[in-house]
């Protein structure tokens, strides 16, 4: 078997435990405890568990949104747990995130055009003409009409907004998508459409997925393998 492109070793994340002025020490919350996972190129690894077991905390730790309390995370053999700002921006070209609630993750003041242009401009530094070409392609591959580029997020349904969220994640042409409950905020009929789109994109673009959900039935469709998080620890399903 080939080497994993993303390796998680003994990663833990704890909150609290700090002494507060003139108050008892805050209790320690073990959000993620000693997690080991391997993600291979072209893989779709599902991570399932009940709400509160640390799935979303793990995803945010991988992305560097919050640091791990212990452990290491490797991308293509490089430890990415202590990257500085510039190094983290380079990593975000290759690893992108799709959020649970598309409406809260899209800036309501910006048009879709501005939302999609932002990562291309900030992370890739490409010119306006190339950004426009890429935006049209992104809208096409998520099955959205090009005229929607000049609309704002509140003008879309939940399913349409999540398609925009997926397009934004694909704007840097990443290798890995971390999908944190990407369909849980959607109606069941729309969930099926988004899952079908994600499977199609994985095959067409050669993507690798870490797919997080509380619903094993949702993961059964897009996942090659599933790990179960229980008491903040994953075990093979």
Question: Which residue stretches match the model-derived regions?
Answer:
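Conserved ABC ATPase signature
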Residues: 152-156, 160
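ABC ATPase NBD coupling module
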Residues: 21-26, 80-96, 114, 122, ...
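Helix-to-loop junction immediately C-terminal to a conserved catalytic motif
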Residues: 63
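P-loop NTP-binding/switch modules centered on Walker-like glycine-rich loops
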Residues: 186, 190-237
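Conserved ABC ATPase "signature" region
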Residues: 79, 129-147
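Conserved ABC transporter NBD signature motif
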Residues: 71-79
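Conserved catalytic motifs of ABC-family nucleotide-binding domains
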Residues: 173
């Amino acid at each position: 078997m080939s080497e994993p492109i993303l390796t998680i070793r003994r990663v833990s994340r704890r909150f609290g435990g700090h002494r507060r002025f003139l108050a008892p020490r805050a209790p320690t919350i073990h959000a993620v405890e000693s997690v080991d996972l391997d993600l291979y190129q072209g893989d779709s690894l599902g991570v399932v568990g009940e709400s509160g077991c640390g799935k979303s905390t793990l995803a945010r730790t991988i992305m560097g949104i919050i640091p791990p309390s212990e452990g290491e995370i490797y991308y293509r053999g490089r430890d990415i747990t202590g990257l500085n700002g510039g190094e983290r921006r380079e990593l975000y070209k290759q690893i992108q995130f799709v959020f649970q609630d598309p409406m809260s993750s899209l800036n309501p003041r910006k048009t879709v055009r501005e939302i999609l242009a932002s990562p291309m401009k900030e992370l890739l530094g490409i010119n306006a003409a190339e950004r426009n070409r890429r935006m049209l392609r992104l809208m096409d591959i998520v099955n959205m009409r090009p005229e929607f580029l000049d609309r704002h997020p509140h003008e879309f349904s939940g399913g349409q907004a999540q398609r925009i969220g997926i397009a934004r994640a694909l704007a840097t042409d990443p290798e890995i998508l971390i999908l944190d409950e990407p369909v849980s905020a959607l109606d069941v009929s729309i969930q099926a459409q988004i899952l079908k789109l994600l499977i199609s994109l994985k095959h067409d673009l050669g993507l690798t997925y870490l797919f997080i959900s509380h619903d094993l039935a949702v993961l059964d469709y897009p996942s090659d393998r599933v790990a179960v998080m229980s008491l903040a620890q994953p075990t093979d399903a």
